[in-house]
Amino acid sequence: MDHIQLVNSQIDINHIHNLLIDESCGASSVFVGTTRDNFDGKKVISLEYESYEKMALKEMSKICSQLRARWPDLKHIAIYHRLGTVPVKEASVVIATSAPHRAAALESVTFAVEQLKSRVPIWKKEIYENDTIGEWKENMECPWPQYSKASLRTFDFSSCKIKQTIENIPDKLVQIRVNDSDLNKRVKCFLKRKRDEINLHNINDFKQQSSQIPCEETTTFSCARTQSFLVKQQQSSGHLKVRRANNCCGPQVRPNYSLQLNKLMTPQSDCDDLIEYKLGNSRLRNIEAYMCVSPDDDNILNRIKNIEDRILLIESTSPEYKHFVQFGTDSEKTCLKKPKKEVYLTDRINEFLTKIKREIEQ
């Protein structure tokens, strides 16, 4: 039977030994890994273990399967590993097997220890006496690929050999015969030049127009709400940044009109009703017709308030078009009306002809 566990407390070796005992087994082999108190002249206080538990248990189960495939006589297998802080002289890992003969038990435990160190994702950190932060250690048994800085920078041409040889290469084809450092330098210079060209075009597209051009010609027919000036971003991957945003009009640059109008529209106790009536009749009718506001209230102050709200709504919705909106007046509408044709009866036509004859005879 296989016994696999990752524990956070002290490992009970006697309990593991009891799991291995069997009537048919004549040998039991137990390996106990403990924490020593020194490493390279440094005094070790404790060890800390961390693990990817799901993957670790899966790999430990595979190790048990390999042990049974190589040594079919194994009866019981136990692999216990401790996680967290392990003080000096305490067990961090226990691997034990039981078999009818000692050779299978001893060889299987040795093989399991090597496989556990090289395959199972468990990481060890050593805590020293004068260094509470500690240092992570890598397993020497793990087959890490050995790379040097030079090998990482150079390309291994032997891995992709070119079997076909080409003779009589045309002169029009560009052939670069330089080392890696010179080639990298040329590529960097090319990328830098292309980036500078892109930055220059972007600045020309978004820069402020010349002061010699009249402002009226540039802003009158513009639908933009803001005028943004963009310049090159120095020492950064982004090459543009907003220097200033100039909002010439709109509700974002205006004061709180609603609060101010509510204060102004508050009726005063000493107001004369007659003056209010004359003022309303002289101005409000034309303003309401121009703003397309219907007079729903008899109170003049409320009617003015409705007109002001209408103006604020139009300006906030589209402030850049407020100077272009022109509504037709009543006088223009009357001029556009077609004259009504008069209808003449036969009797009236006869009278008109008789009158003309009399004037001619006289």
Curated annotation (Swiss-Prot):
It is found in: Cytoplasm. Belongs to the MoaE family. MOCS2B subfamily. One of its GO terms (biological process) is Mo-molybdopterin cofactor biosynthetic process. GO terms for molecular function: molybdopterin synthase activity. Keywords: Cytoplasm, Molybdenum cofactor biosynthesis, Transferase. Catalytic subunit of the molybdopterin synthase complex, a complex that catalyzes the conversion of precursor Z into molybdopterin. Acts by mediating the incorporation of 2 sulfur atoms from thiocarboxylated Mocs2A into precursor Z to generate a dithiolene group. Substrate binds at H101, R102, K117, K124, K125, E126. Heterotetramer; composed of 2 small (Mocs2A) and 2 large (Mocs2B) subunits. Its EC number is 2.8.1.12. It catalyses: 2 [molybdopterin-synthase sulfur-carrier protein]-C-terminal-Gly-aminoethanethioate + cyclic pyranopterin phosphate + H2O = molybdopterin + 2 [molybdopterin-synthase sulfur-carrier protein]-C-terminal Gly-Gly + 2 H(+). This is Molybdopterin synthase catalytic subunit. Pathway: Cofactor biosynthesis; molybdopterin biosynthesis. It holds the Pfam family MoaE. InterPro entries: MoaE_sf, MOCS2B_euk, Mopterin_biosynth_MoaE. This protein is produced by a bicistronic gene which also produces the small subunit (Mocs2A). It comes from the Eukaryota. It is an enzyme of class 2 (transferase). GO terms for cellular component: cytosol; molybdopterin synthase complex.
